[in-house]
Every structure is written in structure tokens, then in C-alpha cells.
């Protein structure tokens, strides 16, 4: 999980990109299934994240409209990273007006000798972002590949149509 996208989000702060990291226990365990990753609250990351979101986005056009749906993720103590991520995904899908992806209820272990031929790391971004007005646009150029919250706080109900204008990289 260490250095994984499963527990990170990028937002735009007044001095540039800020990476928010959800702290987890035993981050260095290799090949730990995400369903078994437990959250670590010893570092007060929830307080830091919520403070960063408020400081960065309170002047965004839609922050006040959506903030109440995000705040519970920074008040409640979730046990597992997977539950936290799924809960947040449900809220994001709901706010964006898109259906929640259907997820499997069971995990099928790969058979011994099965080859995973998918590339391990893709080169460059899969999509080229459609620029939109960001909270600090008057001070810095457009910053792509941020959290969906950045787009949602800036564009509100138009967020999905902005995503639809992205093109293949």
C-alpha cells in the first residue's frame, strides 16, 4: 500500500499540488489485499485532510453545496481502507449523477501458473484533461490529474460533462 494510489489523493492548494495520504497500518506489507488494509488514526490525517480541503476550496463555487457530503469521511473512524474508499466512491458517484460501478462480492484467486500479461505501469496519462477554471487559476496554470473533488467543487453539476471532453493520451 505504501506509495500506492489506493490511499492517496492530489488537491490544489495555494502553493501548488498537495498530496493527501490516508495513513494505514503495516503499509510495507507486500501484496496485502486492499480489503485487509486497516486505517491508522495515530497521525490525525483526517483533521489535516479536512483542514486542507476547507483552506483550498472554501472559495470554490460549489464547495458549500458539496462539503457536507465529504465531511463525514473526516469525522468517522473507518476500520478498513476498502470500506473508506467504497464509501467515498459511492458519494462521488451520487454527486456526479453516475451509477455506482457494480462490484463483485467474491474474490477468485488466480490459479498457480496463471500469467498476468497486463502492463505493470502505463507510460504517461491515459487521458488528457480538459482544462476548467480551478480555485487558484488566477495565480497558476491549469493543473491536471487532481482529485475528482477539485473538479466537483469547481464545476458542480457540469463535472461529468467536463470529464466527457477529456481525450485519449
Where is each model-derived feature located?
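Residues lining hydrophobic/aromatic ligand-binding pockets adjacent to catalytic sites
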Residues: 1-169
Amino acid at each position: 500500500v505504501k506509495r500506492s494510489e489506493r490511499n492517496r489523493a492530489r488537491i490544489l492548494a495555494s502553493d501548488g499540488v498537495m498530496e493527501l495520504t490516508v495513513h494505514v497500518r503495516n503499509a510495507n506489507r507486500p501484496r496485502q489485499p486492499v480489503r485487509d488494509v486497516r486505517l491508522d488514526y495515530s497521525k490525525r490525517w483526517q483533521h489535516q485532510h479536512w483542514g486542507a480541503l476547507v483552506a483550498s476550496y472554501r472559495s470554490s463555487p460549489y464547495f458549500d453545496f458539496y462539503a457536507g457530503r465529504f465531511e463525514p469521511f473526516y469525522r468517522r473512524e473507518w476500520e478498513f481502507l476498502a470500506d473508506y474508499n467504497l464509501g467515498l466512491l459511492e458519494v462521488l458517484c451520487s454527486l456526479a449523477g453516475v451509477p455506482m460501478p457494480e462490484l463483485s462480492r467474491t474474490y477468485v484467486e488466480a490459479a498457480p501458473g496463471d500469467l498476468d500479461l497486463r502492463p505493470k505501469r502505463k507510460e504517461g496519462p491515459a487521458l488528457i484533461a480538459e482544462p476548467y477554471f480551478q480555485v487558484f487559476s488566477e495565480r497558476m496554470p491549469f493543473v491536471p490529474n487532481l482529485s475528482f473533488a477539485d473538479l466537483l467543487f469547481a464545476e458542480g453539476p457540469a463535472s461529468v460533462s467536463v470529464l466527457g471532453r477529456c481525450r485519449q493520451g
